[in-house]
Amino acid sequence: FEKRELRIKPGAYMQEEKLTNTGLPPQGQGRNGGYDGYIRHKLVVIAVLAVVVAGIAVLSMGMGALSLSAKDVVLALFGQGDARAVAAVQNIRLPRVLTAIVAGIALSLAGCAYQSVLRNPLASASTLGISQGAAFGASIAIIVLAGGGGSSAAYEGVSSADPVMTALLAFAGAMLSTVLILLLSRVREMTPESIVLLGVALSAVFTAGTTLVQYFAEDSQVAAVVFWTFGDLSRVNEDQLALMAIVTLVGAVVFHLNRWDFNAMESGEGLAHSLGISVSKVRLANMFVASAVASTVIAFCGIVNFVGLVAPHVMRRLLGSDYRYLLPASAIAGAGLLLVSDMLCHVIVAPLILPISAITSFVGAPVFIYLLFKGVNR
């Protein structure tokens, strides 16, 4: 790790020797010139990123069996133009795009919060066992509680189980992993590194439980569980999307209120304690909120890999670790990553639709590997 010296002077802004990891303004620059330029750079990056994501959303709504131009998409959003275009955009494509945006924002914010409070760049819903816990809960709903729907197709198997019950048990399984981590970490006062390792162990336990449940299931039920784990943005209805948006908004507000705590913890727990921050309370509270946000998305959309891991890393490279800007930038980047992945799902082997989790892994994993190799000397 890079040795950093933090200086705090009365009436001055916090400054560091280097910009490399924290994104704070370098020393030797005036308060107005250096700091204003530092802020302006980050705001410009976030604004450009938001415009790019908006363009991707319009492009996504124009792709499909009925190809539409950007102008046609905009007209259809306002109920004007060709009737077929209006129906396709408003009834099918817009809900899917909104789901991708909300889910991408939620997973990225959760991943950013995990990586901050645990001080571990590999912390995410997958490495903490949250995704695996959700899969275990969904398996119970589809296989045990559905009572053997006898469906002949995977998507029919998912629909034969009560979708509300499936979502509830998936959410319960995801939160069970979180509660176990929080309880065990409080009993033994685990370090952040140990908490991540505990999450990996719980992932193995939930995966084993899912395997055992599938072993005693019928073929159609196993196919239904596998189909659920693929992830699907199209199966989210309006009520579920609204709930996802509300939970995500609450999580975003909580993380925003804790942005200064995240910045202090980024410079070390010792400094955070000296500033009067209860590190353990901040860690546990934000882990719980992040898990609730991620679990809600996974419960409705299925497992979506790498979004919460890659988006914060990319934005940290561009903007540094100032969470005032890293949080919104990660949210926008996550939305863009999931939108691009959803587009690829629909165009690679059209008219077939590929699993969203596979595409996010294919897109996210190479980016993550590149970032690791690029920063290997730091």
Model-derived features: positions:
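Polybasic, lysine-rich low-complexity intrinsically disordered segments
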Residues: 3-4
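Alpha-helical transmembrane segments in inner-membrane proteins
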Residues: 7-378
